[in-house]
Amino acid sequence: MEKNEKIHADMQALGRAACAAARIVAKADTATKNHALAMMARAIRRDEALLLAANAKDVAQARNKGLESAMIDRLTLTSRGVVSMATGLEQIATLPDPIGAMTDLDYRPSGIQVGKMRVPLGVIGIIYEARPNVTADAAGLCLKAGNAAILRGGSEAIQSNQAIAICVREGLRSAGLPEQTMQVVETTDRAAVSALITMSEYVDVIVPRGGKGLIERITNEARVPVIKHLDGVCHVYVDLSADLEKAVRVADNAKTQRYGTCNTMETLLVHTGIAEQFLPRICQIFLEKEVELRGDEAACALVSRMKPAVEEDWYAEYLAPILSVRIVADIDEAITHIATYGSQHTDTIVTENYSRARQFLREVDSSSVMVNASTRFADGFEYGLGAEIGISTDKLHARGPVGLEGLTSQKFIVLGDGHIRE
């Protein structure tokens, strides 16, 4: 059997096993699912040293291959990160179980009662690159939402993902649930991705997390619905009526708290009427933190160490200590810039003007739109969703951070007492 044929056969076997497991986990009660989550968390805490050792091997190989610093940052697990994975699973256990919830029940003139019931999606294929924590987060969220999952992590994190998967399977066994509820693809061959995204007979939805190239490929080739975002070109607009202290805090945090995340600010927009006061101050902070600044002509005139920006900079998701800066005439120009160059991820306005705040919330067409808050808050945990499986900039099926509810669907339910249609 040729290599690709074997990979295809192996993926088909994973798909069949996932479908069988999905039927079982969909019926699992809340206590069983929560017990599995607790046991996963316990195993992760217990095996911290093993997880860190596996991750250290992945990081060493990544450095030897010359991978970018942003990729290595996302790949690296710390003791704090291991604890965070376990805590995330425990927090998912505390979240309300959405499965079986009935809403919108109403009697119709015919006498029947019509409503909706929340149900699992089924089998979720999750494709991700360098973040080992996604293995635990995705397993926990998919389980609590009553789904089975097939997890395909990046080759750079294969040893970390396999070590975490051992803990996940232990938790499932402890709760009497099939280990096949959460399966990790063992091969790093890209043919496995092609097989996974075309198995419409087994997989109900694909959630990709990674670089633009990966997500574009999956979107173009998939025969299964995809929940995704391509880029995180996030903006902070500092309005004429902004409180400068708030603006400094928000802009600094949005850019420098962590460079390699999709909710990091990549472009700073500043109203021309406040630019002379604000830009030199905030840019001095950025320069002290070794952030490279690229600005339009007006911004460069105010900050001598700023490089001229080119057209590509406005579209760029740097994931690095680089920031684009533009001075705009008013809020309308800021909104137009975001509509032209943004990625519909997360954008914020800093302003003390209520009407302009409302205008920004209404007119900016992004999955998260904020007022006087850092873009770094665009996160399932910060939104009270628990760990997120990703952020969607699509408008169907889920939008924004995708937590438990985003991993479910609804079906209509009809209650009668021998009713017939006349």
From Swiss-Prot:
Q: Name one GO cellular component term.
A: cytoplasm
Task: Specify where it is mainly localized.
Answer: cytoplasm
**Record's SUPFAM superfamilies?**
ALDH-like
Catalyzed chemical reaction(s):
L-glutamate 5-semialdehyde + phosphate + NADP(+) = L-glutamyl 5-phosphate + NADPH + H(+)
* Pathway it works in: Amino-acid biosynthesis; L-proline biosynthesis; L-glutamate 5-semialdehyde from L-glutamate: step 2/2
InterPro entries referenced in this protein's UniProt entry, alphabetically: Ald_DH/histidinol_DH, Ald_DH_C, Ald_DH_N, Aldehyde_DH_dom, G-glutamylP_reductase_CS, Glu-5-SA_DH, GPR_dom
Q: Name one Pfam family in it.
A: Aldedh
Q: Where in the cell is the protein located? A: Cytoplasm
EC number annotated for this UniProt entry: 1.2.1.41
Class in the EC hierarchy, top level: oxidoreductase
Q: Which GO terms describe its biological process?
A: L-proline biosynthetic process
* Single GO MF annotation: NADP binding
Enumerate the UniProt keywords alphabetically. Amino-acid biosynthesis, Cytoplasm, NADP, Oxidoreductase, Proline biosynthesis
Please tell me whether the keyword Cell membrane is annotated for this protein.
no
User: What function does the entry list?
Assistant: Catalyzes the NADPH-dependent reduction of L-glutamate 5-phosphate into L-glutamate 5-semialdehyde and phosphate. The product spontaneously undergoes cyclization to form 1-pyrroline-5-carboxylate.
Q: Which HAMAP family match?
A: ProA
Q: Which family does it belong to?
A: Belongs to the gamma-glutamyl phosphate reductase family.
Q: What is this protein called?
A: Gamma-glutamyl phosphate reductase
Record organism: Nitrosomonas eutropha (strain DSM 101675 / C91 / Nm57)
